[in-house]
UniProtKB/Swiss-Prot annotation:
Protein name: LexA repressor
Keywords: Autocatalytic cleavage, DNA damage, DNA repair, DNA replication, DNA-binding, Hydrolase, Repressor, SOS response, Transcription, Transcription regulation
InterPro entries (UniProt xref): LexA, LexA-like, LexA/Signal_pep-like_sf, LexA_DNA-bd_dom, LexA_repressor, Peptidase_S24_LexA, Peptidase_S24_S26A/B/C, WH-like_DNA-bd_sf
GO BP of this protein: DNA repair; DNA replication; negative regulation of DNA-templated transcription; proteolysis; SOS response
Species this protein is from: Burkholderia multivorans (strain ATCC 17616 / 249)
Length: 215
């Protein structure tokens, strides 16, 4: 791997940890807050330096458009699409009616063409986030969460799940006797789900985020 300065290594490691933990990279503002930079512009300068050294690639116009490139320290290797290749067409899911599939036609408000390089792996749909329970993970009301359909998830991953009649976005942690759905906002309570509960169904994992207004 190209030799980095101590500060550049801190930024690179922060990006790597964020992708390992949640499936998508941090925003410039999150990098600045975590590492004590005076502004997101300072984070941008370090990101551009890392891009010049060939260890990351930046996608213009996306707050989380950061991809780790190859190397022993990169947990994911992203392949950027060549110009002219077809983008992903992803359905946008709005409100989900109780008891019906998330991807039921009546839930899909529109489709978006998205650069596949924005995501840690290929998503199946975009879910419009409602509320601020995941605020401290950088997921805000109105954001579009890229979701890959899964029936299993690892500890620490951000998931989309059905809980009774509701669809929720939380961080999953296994506990004795069940799982805990962790809110990333102290104003919201975590939710414990007993093992085998008929009220719980995993719908997918987060593989990226598009800030409201970026599409």
């Amino acid at each position: 791997m190209t030799k980095l300065t101590a500060r550049q290594q801190q930024v690179f490691d922060l990006i790597r940890r964020a992708i390992e933990r949640s499936g998508f990279p941090p925003t410039r503002a999150e990098i600045a807050a975590e590492l004590g930079f005076s502004s997101p512009n300072a984070a941008e300068e370090h990101l551009r330096a890392l891009a010049r050294k060939g260890v990351i690639e930046l996608a213009a116009g996306a707050s989380r458009g950061i991809r780790l490139l190859g190397g022993d320290d990169a947990p994911h290797q992203f392949t950027l699409p060549h110009a002219g290749l077809m983008q992903l067409s992803l359905p946008l899911v709005g409100r989900v009616a109780a008891g019906s599939p998330i991807l039921a036609q009546e839930h899909i408000s529109q489709h978006f063409a998205c650069d596949p390089a924005l995501f840690s792996s290929k998503p199946d749909y975009l879910l419009k986030v409602r509320g601020l329970s995941m605020r401290d993970a950088g997921i805000l009301d109105g954001d579009l969460l890229a979701v890959q359909k899964r029936t299993e998830a690892k500890d620490g991953q951000i998931i989309v799940a059905r809980l009774g009649d509701d669809v929720t976005v939380k961080r999953l942690m296994r506990r004795p006797g069940g799982i805990e759905l962790i809110a990333e906002n102290p104003d919201y309570e975590n939710i414990f789900v007993k093992a085998g509960s008929a009220d719980f169904a995993l719908e997918g994992i987060a593989v990226g985020l598009i800030r409201s207004g970026e599409l």
